C-alpha cells in the first residue's frame, strides 16, 4: 500500500479515528486480524453480504451518512427476511482516489447511528484505496433459533403472497433523481417528492418482522431488485405468483405519481430498492400474521396467491386483465 497523502491519515490512524469507536465486543478495538463471535446456546448464525458501488447503487454526491445507512441497511434487510436478529457486521471499504476526511467522518457517523439503532456493532473488515469508484461491502451476521431460518423457496400452492410496507417508492425516487424535470414527477408537491427521494436514500430493514416470519412464513426474501422480478425468484418448480395489482400497497406519494402518469405503475412494480419483506404464508394464517405485524409497527398487505404453473408472475388489473410485466429483476450483468 502506498503512503498516505500529506493531508490524510494513514490506514492505521484512519481506522483508529473513524472505525475503532464503532467496534463491538470480540473485535479487540480493531487491533487484531480477526474477531470472534459465539452464538447463544441453541442458536445458529446467519451470514449475508452485499456491496454497494458509487455510480451503481448510490450517487457519488449522496451524503456520506446516507451512504453508510444504506450499506448497512440493505444487509440487515436480508437478515430480517431470513428471520434473524442482527449481531454484528464486517466492513470492507474501498475509498476513491479523491476521498476526504470530511466524507469519511460523515460516513463513520452514519454507520454509528445505524449500528446503534439496529443493535449491530462492527467486528472488523478492511480499508483500501480503490482504483475506480468507491465501494462498500458489508457482511452482516445475524442469529436465530437453530433450524428456523426462513428459506426463499418454501412457498406452496395455495399460500398467500404478502408484502410489508409500500412498494415502488424507491424506484420512483430514483426516477426523480435521474430526471428531476420529468413531466409527471415534476408536478408532485415537494412533500411527495421528498418521501420518494428519502425511500431511495434510506432503506428501512424490517427487523421487527423477523420473529413473525419464523412462525408464519413458508418462504421469504426482501424486495431489493423489484417486486415482479423477486416474485419470479421466489417461485418456480410448478409454482407461479398470481398478484392483484389493486392490492399492492402504494404510498400516497406513489399514488399521486401514478395518477399523473399511469405508466409509472410498472416502474413501481418492477423497480428495485424497496427493501420490504416479500413472503408467503399458509391459507388461514394471513390474518393473524398481519395483526401481529401491525402490532409490531409494520403494515403487511396480502397481494395474491401462489398458483400452480410455470412462468413469470401474473398481475391482474382492476379491470380483470391479466398481464406479465416486461421488466424483470435488476441484474448487474
Where do the model's predicted regions map?
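Glycine/charged-rich beta-loop-alpha catalytic/anionic-binding loops adjacent to active sites
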Residues: 52-61, 144, 190-196
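Glycine-/charge-enriched secondary-structure boundary and capping motifs
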Residues: 1-20, 63, 95-123, 128-136, ...
Amino acid at each position: 500500500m502506498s503512503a498516505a497523502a500529506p493531508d490524510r491519515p494513514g490506514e492505521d490512524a484512519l481506522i483508529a479515528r473513524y472505525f475503532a469507536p464503532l467496534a463491538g465486543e470480540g473485535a479487540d478495538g480493531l487491533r487484531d486480524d480477526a474477531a470472534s463471535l459465539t452464538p447463544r446456546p441453541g442458536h445458529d448464525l446467519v451470514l449475508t453480504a452485499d456491496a454497494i458501488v458509487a455510480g451503481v447503487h448510490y450517487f457519488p454526491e449522496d451524503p456520506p451518512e446516507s451512504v453508510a445507512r444504506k450499506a448497512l441497511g440493505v444487509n440487515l434487510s436480508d437478515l430480517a427476511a431470513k428471520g434473524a436478529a442482527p449481531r454484528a457486521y464486517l466492513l470492507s471499504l474501498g475509498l476513491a482516489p479523491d476521498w476526504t476526511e470530511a466524507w469519511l467522518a460523515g460516513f463513520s457517523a452514519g454507520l454509528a447511528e445505524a449500528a446503534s439503532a439496529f443493535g449491530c456493532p462492527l467486528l472488523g473488515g478492511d480499508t483500501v484505496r480503490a482504483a475506480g469508484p468507491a465501494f462498500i461491502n458489508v457482511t452482516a451476521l445475524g442469529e436465530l433459533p437453530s433450524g428456523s431460518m426462513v428459506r426463499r423457496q418454501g412457498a406452496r400452492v395455495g399460500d398467500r403472497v404478502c408484502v410489508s410496507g409500500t412498494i415502488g417508492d424507491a424506484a420512483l425516487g430514483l426516477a426523480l433523481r435521474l430526471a428531476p424535470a420529468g413531466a409527471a414527477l415534476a408536478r408532485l408537491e415537494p412533500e411527495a417528492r421528498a418521501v420518494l427521494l428519502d425511500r431511495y436514500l434510506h432503506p428501512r430493514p424490517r427487523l421487527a418482522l423477523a420473529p413473525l416470519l419464523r412462525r408464519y412464513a413458508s418462504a421469504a426474501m426482501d424486495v431489493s431488485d423489484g417486486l415482479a422480478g423477486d416474485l419470479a425468484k421466489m417461485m418456480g418448480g410448478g409454482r407461479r405468483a398470481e398478484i392483484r395489482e389493486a392490492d399492492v400497497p402504494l404510498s400516497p406519494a406513489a399514488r399521486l405519481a401514478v395518477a399523473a402518469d399511469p405508466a409509472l405503475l410498472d416502474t413501481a412494480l418492477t423497480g428495485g430498492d424497496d427493501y420490504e419483506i416479500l413472503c408467503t404464508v399458509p391459507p388461514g394464517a394471513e390474518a393473524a400474521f398481519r395483526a401481529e405485524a401491525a402490532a409490531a409497527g409494520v403494515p403487511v398487505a396480502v397481494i395474491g396467491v401462489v398458483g400452480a404453473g410455470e412462468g413469470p408472475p401474473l398481475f391482474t388489473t382492476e379491470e380483470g386483465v391479466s398481464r406479465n410485466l416486461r421488466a424483470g429483476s435488476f441484474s448487474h450483468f
